[in-house]
């Protein structure tokens, strides 16, 4: 069983050929085997790993290979596809994985840096396997490599896959056309993130097949683990309106060829643009439109990103109840889609981290977002620049200026790789702050000018507004051309309202803490004070009714009250 990273009882029975009773007896008798009651899965204690490796080293190679392949087959049958991929790769056996029907939706969460070697190894053995009419997994591997930015290898694979499909006598003409449409979809994504060129690629699909592509599309969130469509597709300073127009023009055809993948992305992009320009009312309207569109196709990542902008708007206005409600919805939606839960949970963590950094509660940020190596090992390559913005803000808030300065070159390089403008603006702002705080005033002015130079042509104010308290003196000191004065005046104007909103939200949070209640307990208490039943509270907060009951007991104890009626005194 040691070849499994974790396993359930059924897998144990298959792998060992033992009956349930004997498996349980053995599992329960070994202290170094851990059991997770929530997932009902077993795993070996890390202390046991060294011993296990020694045992395996002393066994005949053929026997170890046989055990590993049996475990791979078990994982494949049980739908644990990435676990199967790892074991097949380790055993140098690739036929079954290439010929199996696997959904990309089950593979996408594992397309992260720490797993790159597995994907690359399997891709390198494409040429060794007879496909026998099965090319789904080959295309999945192709798109996965594209997400590792391995464009050269992807182009080589696509050329040979195209040739093999054309020569495959097993396939009907209709099936060949279907595969060709899928190949064209991947080719379009080789032009990421130039949506103009991507659009040209998508339009070719309409002439190849009348059916929607379905092997890749729908298997990954349109916005990956990034809550900002604008971050992904704004790539040229001064061209934001043109880029937005291109997305809006392409959306109907993209939805047609993908059966609604990313539905609502063009409304969300415009909402993002308007928010960054300080047009909160316009952004709010378009967020509601994006939510409606995304909900019609279960596009949860778009849904979450829309609520993220709404949470930012509520923060600006100082509307604490709306702010908390939008944040709760982000968390609830992330739990809704269980098959994609890993990527959606990451997206939720990233949204929360952004909001916590805005109200200077950086200690509440998820642990993995505070660790640069874990970020690089956990986040899709296309989303990495956005998470680096959050990590950079975390370092600035904690006054780790030298740490940020040390990694800034790497961050700028990654931003340039995809021509990401928004992360570049934030990085320059953080560089200005870090240099100012370390006594390098001339450099600070230089980097602030660079940030303004990128942002001013498209009227992107919010990165400066979010950091205004740290850069206000620099902005006043920096010598900027006459053309930029209007831009700076708008930043100052928007910042006044933003700082009031942040103070209001922070004050509300402190008031709850003064009662001795956690945020969750305060939410429950407030609804209870309004005479909502436990069931109604559970539905509104997306928690179990039993959780509400246990919270109410704690609330009564902390506030030293005996009835719900007394709660009104605390929330008037």
Indicate residue ranges for each PLM-predicted region:
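Helix-turn-helix DNA-binding segment
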Residues: 503-553, 557-572
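Helix-turn-helix repeat elements of alpha-solenoid scaffolds
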Residues: 78, 107-121, 150-167, 193-210, ...
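C-terminal boundary/linker of central alpha/beta nucleotide-binding cores
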Residues: 1-57, 66-69
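Amphipathic alpha-helical segments of tetratricopeptide repeats
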Residues: 85, 105-106, 123-127, 159-172, ...
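Extended alpha-helical scaffolding segments used for macromolecular assembly and cargo binding
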Residues: 54-137, 141-144, 153
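Internal alpha-solenoid helical repeat scaffolds
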Residues: 129-305
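Alpha-solenoid helical repeat architecture
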Residues: 80-82, 94-98, 134-135, 171-181, ...
């Amino acid at each position: 069983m040691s070849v499994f990273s974790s396993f359930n009882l059924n897998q144990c029975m298959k792998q060992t050929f033992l009956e349930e009773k004997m498996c349980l007896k053995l599992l329960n008798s070994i202290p170094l085997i851990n059991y997770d009651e929530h997932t009902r899965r077993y795993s070996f204690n890390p202390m046991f790993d060294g011993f296990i490796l020694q045992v395996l080293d002393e066994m005949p190679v053929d026997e170890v290979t046989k055990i590993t392949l049996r475990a791979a087959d078990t994982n494949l049958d049980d739908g644990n596809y990435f676990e199967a991929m790892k074991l097949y790769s380790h055993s140098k056996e690739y036929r079954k994985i290439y010929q199996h029907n696997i959904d990309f939706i089950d593979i996408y969460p594992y397309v992260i840096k720490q797993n790159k070697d597995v994907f690359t190894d399997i891709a390198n053995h494409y040429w060794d396997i007879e496909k026998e009419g099965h090319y789904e997994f080959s295309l999945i591997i192709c798109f996965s490599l594209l997400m590792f930015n391995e464009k050269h290898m992807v182009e080589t694979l696509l050329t040979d896959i195209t040739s093999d499909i054309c020569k495959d006598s097993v396939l009907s003409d209709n099936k060949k056309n279907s595969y060709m449409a899928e190949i064209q979809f991947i080719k379009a994504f080789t032009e990421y993130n130039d949506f103009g060129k991507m659009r040209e690629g998508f339009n070719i699909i309409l002439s190849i097949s009348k059916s929607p592509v379905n092997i890749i599309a729908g298997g990954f969130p349109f916005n990956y683990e990034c809550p900002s469509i604008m971050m992904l597709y704004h790539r040229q300073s001064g061209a934001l309106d043109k880029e937005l127009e291109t997305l809006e023009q392409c959306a109907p055809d993209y939805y047609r060829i993908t059966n609604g993948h990313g539905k609502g992305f063009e409304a969300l992009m415009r909402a993002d643009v308007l928010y960054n320009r300080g047009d909160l009312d316009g952004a709010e309207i378009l967020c509601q439109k994006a939510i409606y569109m995304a909900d019609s196709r279960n596009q949860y990542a778009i849904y979450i990103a829309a609520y993220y902008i709404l949470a930012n708007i509520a923060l600006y206005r100082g509307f604490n109840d709306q702010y908390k409600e939008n944040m709760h919805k982000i968390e609830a939606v992330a739990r809704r889609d269980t098959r994609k839960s890993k990527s959606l949970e990451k997206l939720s963590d990233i949204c929360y981290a952004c909001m916590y950094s805005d109200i200077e509660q950086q200690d509440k940020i998820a642990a993995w977002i505070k660790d640069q190596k874990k970020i690089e090992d956990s986040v899709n390559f296309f989303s990495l620049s956005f998470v680096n913005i959050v990590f950079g803000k975390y370092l600035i808030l904690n006054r780790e200026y030298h740490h940020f300065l040390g990694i800034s070159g790497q961050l700028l390089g990654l931003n340039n790789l995809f021509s990401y403008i928004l992360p570049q603006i934030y990085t320059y702002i953080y560089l200005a702050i870090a240099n100012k705080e370390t006594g390098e005033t001339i450099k600070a002015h230089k980097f602030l000018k660079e940030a303004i130079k990128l942002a001013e042509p498209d009227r992107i104010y919010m990165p400066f507004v979010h950091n205004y308290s740290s850069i206000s003196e620099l902005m006043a000191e920096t010598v900027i051309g006459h053309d930029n004065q209007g831009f700076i005046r708008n930043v100052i104007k928007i910042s006044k309202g933003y700082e009031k909103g942040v103070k209001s939200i922070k004050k509300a949070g402190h008031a709850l803490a003064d009662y001795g209640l956690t945020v969750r307990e305060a939410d429950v208490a407030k609804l209870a004070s309004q005479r909502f039943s436990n069931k109604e509270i559970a539905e509104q907060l997306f928690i179990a009714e039993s959780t509400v009951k246990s919270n109410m007991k704690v609330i009564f104890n902390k506030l030293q009250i005996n009835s719900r009626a007394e709660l009104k005194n605390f929330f008037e």
